[in-house]
Regions:
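Membrane-interface anchor segments at the N-terminal boundary of transmembrane helices
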Residues: 106-124, 342-417
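Membrane-interface transmembrane helices that cradle and orient dolichyl/undecaprenyl
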Residues: 182-201
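Transmembrane-helix motifs of polytopic, lipid-linked glycan transferases
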Residues: 116-143
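Membrane-interface alpha helices of multi-pass inner-membrane proteins
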Residues: 198-214
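Transmembrane signal-anchor helices characteristic of membrane glycosylation enzymes that use polyprenol
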Residues: 9-69, 248-260
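Membrane-proximal stem/loop segments at transmembrane-domain junctions that anchor or position
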Residues: 47-81, 259-360
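Short hydrophobic/aromatic helix or loop-helix immediately within or flanking a transmembrane segment
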Residues: 68-109
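Membrane-interfacial entry segments at the cytosolic side of transmembrane helices
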Residues: 10-14, 194-199, 232-249
Length: 473
């Protein structure tokens, strides 16, 4: 009896300690956020017309004012004037709304402090962590999996390079919340009847994730296979076929329509063509000639925002994603080169942007708060070894797929993350080329970590069950 009570107390203490650590890391990381690369303006125009204490929102390129506004320094204070001028919607707005309201009521009616706007992001992540801990607490080997699953997740989502997104008005802020939400729902569906409540929760989770950014569209068809197997649809098509179509079509249409950036012109297609496939082509001049762009060879060295737009202006009508496809059909080996290119640059959560406000000496004391990011950069596999590790993760999934309970659930979550990281990487590099590649590979990097933790814990759960190892709890 005494052992039972001590075990229960250990579970509760560990649970409270893990929650407290996540809260502490978030508090300590409040002074950090990622500098704006120009994407802020797409979303912030709903509630802010620009930085609060800088003279202009778009200073001339190359000036000290431009350098301070973009890329090099994080801007924590924004005008709170609600211009409502954005032409797109992002589900992260739902997370920022509570913090913006509290800011207006209790802090300032005219100046928005970005860390306060991030309150909703942090609270929802805390709630998801609490839900995960509750599930582990009432499952087999709770102490083991709290230490090997929940604690590493806190280190991942609390590391400075990830937490900086919470204070930034990037689309990834929403993805970092609604991705774990969807994974929790998928795991939950593996251990309970998939009734109307389950499908309602799944529909909400996938809708929020798909509307977090345009590149997340693939989650709608991908995740469905894990909650509504094909054999079930074929067995009862009158019931499940309309459900399957609705669970794919509605979030897919909403995501593509709401997150589309209006008036962007050939920007992304230019980056995908000149900054993407042509950079890996063995005969770029020949490909340009075939596309009727022979006179645009000099554009290969130019980013869209640094001369590329003017360079290619006479040929905008010829620059499209169909041109990207034509290059890939002419040189299909580019697909493998893209995979190698991404693999060589994997395992890096740090962007090439500034992370601190002007005059802040915080970086001198912040490395200790970036433990997971540094660990990942130094010891996680990249290049050819990344491919080997993906195969090993696949083997781990195969070994635990048919296991009941936690092991089987984690195997499914691991496979979902594994497939998503490959798809997401290609969507990003095909969609926007090599521009801001570290930022675009951020979500695939997080997905690798989630897959690794899921498969590792699935193997632990299977091993503990098979050999009858008794751990505390």
């Amino acid at each position: 009896m005494k052992f039972l009570f001590s075990t229960i107390n250990l579970r509760r203490m560990l649970k409270i300690g893990i929650l407290a650590l996540f809260v502490l890391l978030n508090i300590l990381n409040l002074p950090a956020g990622w500098a704006d690369n120009g994407d802020y303006n797409r979303i912030t125009q709903w509630f802010s017309s620009g930085p609060a204490f800088l003279p202009e929102n778009f200073p001339p390129a190359g000036t000290p004012a431009w350098d301070r506004r973009f890329y090099s320094e994080w801007v924590p204070f924004w005008k709170l004037d609600f211009p409502l001028a954005s032409g797109m919607f992002n589900s992260a707005l739902l997370l920022w709304a509570p913090g913006i309201l509290i800011n207006k009521l209790l802090y300032s009616g005219s100046v928005l402090w970005a860390p306060l706007a991030s309150l909703g992001v942090r609270l929802v992540l805390l709630a998801l962590l609490w839900r995960l801990l509750n599930g582990l607490e009432h499952g087999p080997r709770p102490v083991l999996h709290m230490l090997t699953l929940a604690l590493p997740l806190v280190l991942l989502f609390g590391t400075r390079d990830v937490a900086a997104f919470y204070n930034s008005f990037y689309q990834e802020a929403g993805t970092l919340v609604f991705l774990p939400l969807l994974l929790l729902v998928v795991g939950w569906g593996c251990t309970r009847p998939r009734d109307a409540w389950f499908y309602a929760a799944y529909a909400a989770a996938v809708l929020l994730l798909v509307t977090s950014k345009t590149a997340a569209f693939y989650w709608a068809p991908l995740a469905l296979a894990f909650v509504l197997p094909l054999h079930k649809v074929l067995r009862q098509p009158r019931i499940y076929l309309p459900l399957a179509v609705g669970l794919v079509a509605v979030p897919l249409a909403a995501g593509l329509m709401l997150t589309h950036v209006p008036n962007i012109g050939p920007n992304r297609a230019y980056n995908a063509l000149f900054g993407g496939v042509l950079q890996l082509s063995e005969a770029p001049q020949q490909r340009l000639t075939e596309l009727g762009l022979a006179q645009s060879e000099r554009c290969l060295a130019l980013d869209w925002y640094n001369g590329g737009a003017d360079c290619s202006r006479p040929d905008w009508d010829k620059i499209s994603y169909s041109a990207v496809v034509r290059v890939l059909l002419a040189e299909p080996q580019i697909v493998l080169k893209q995979a190698q290119f991404m693999a060589d640059r994997s395992q890096n959560l740090s962007l090439s942007f500034g992370q601190y406000a002007f005059g802040d000496d915080y970086p001198r004391r912040a490395d200790r708060l970036n433990l997971w990011s540094r660990l990942k950069a130094n010891i996680f596999p990249r290049g050819g070894w990344l491919a080997v590790s993906l195969l090993l993760l696949g083997a781990g999934i195969a070994a635990t797929w048919k296991q009941p309970g936690l092991a089987g659930s984690l195997a499914r979550v691991g496979l979902l993350c594994l497939l998503a990281l490959v798809i997401d990487g290609y969507v990003e590099i095909l969609g926007d080329g090599q521009r801001d590649l570290l930022k675009h590979l951020f979500i695939p990097n997080v997905l690798f970590d989630l897959a690794l933790l899921a498969v590792f814990n699935a193997l632990l759960a299977r091993g503990a069950a098979a050999f009858g190892r008794k751990t505390p709890g």
